[in-house]
């Protein structure tokens, strides 16, 4: 978020025209005492990479942060739960136009949109899911549903699975659902 807010800082950290040591020093000065050692290690690694643009740097950091949360969920054997909850949240938002507008409204503060989401789902989902859903509200480039879909794609990669969305005219019975899963697993 700091790199998104502080465009000059982001440009300086991603500027491949300057020495990697200078970029490293900048990262140390700004972040050393404010982030976890793992986060600091990731930020240090960014200073040695070549970035097409400052936005490419922030997108990469965002993806790595999402991966870290999802890896933690996988290690705790909660990845399927988190992915399922994210999918249902996305469907909930997609299915209600007023909610879609409220969560995506650029005239509302990010904090307000996150509070709305927390009020709706906070006590119904895992901590990891809530963290990711609140993070998905931050994006100004994509809709909430698009961001969550990206998170679901990362979750599927981590689980070494493919995703399939099946739409039916009526609710499936347990037997039909089992048969569908069997067919999709082929």
Task: Go through each PLM region and give its residues.
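Elongated, mostly alpha-helical coiled-coil "stalk/stator" tethers of large membrane protein machines
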Residues: 1-186
């Amino acid at each position: 978020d700091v790199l998104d807010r502080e465009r000059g800082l982001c440009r300086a950290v991603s500027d491949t025209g300057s020495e990697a040591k200078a970029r490293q020093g900048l990262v140390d000065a700004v972040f050393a005492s404010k982030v976890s050692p793992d986060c600091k290690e990731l930020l240090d690694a960014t200073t040695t990479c070549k970035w097409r643009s400052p936005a490419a740097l922030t997108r990469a950091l965002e993806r790595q942060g999402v991966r870290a949360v999802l890896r933690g969920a996988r290690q705790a054997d909660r990845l399927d739960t988190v992915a399922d909850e994210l999918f249902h949240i996305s469907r909930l938002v997609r299915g209600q136009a007023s909610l879609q507008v409220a969560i995506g409204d650029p005239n509302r503060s990010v904090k307000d949109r996150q509070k709305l989401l927390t009020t709706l789902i906070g006590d119904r989902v895992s901590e990891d899911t809530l963290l990711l859903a609140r993070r998905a509200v931050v994006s100004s480039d994509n809709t909430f549903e698009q961001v969550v879909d990206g998170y679901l794609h990362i979750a599927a990669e981590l689980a070494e699975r493919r995703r399939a969305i099946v739409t039916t005219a009526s609710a499936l019975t347990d037997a039909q659902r089992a048969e569908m899963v069997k067919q999709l697993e082929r």
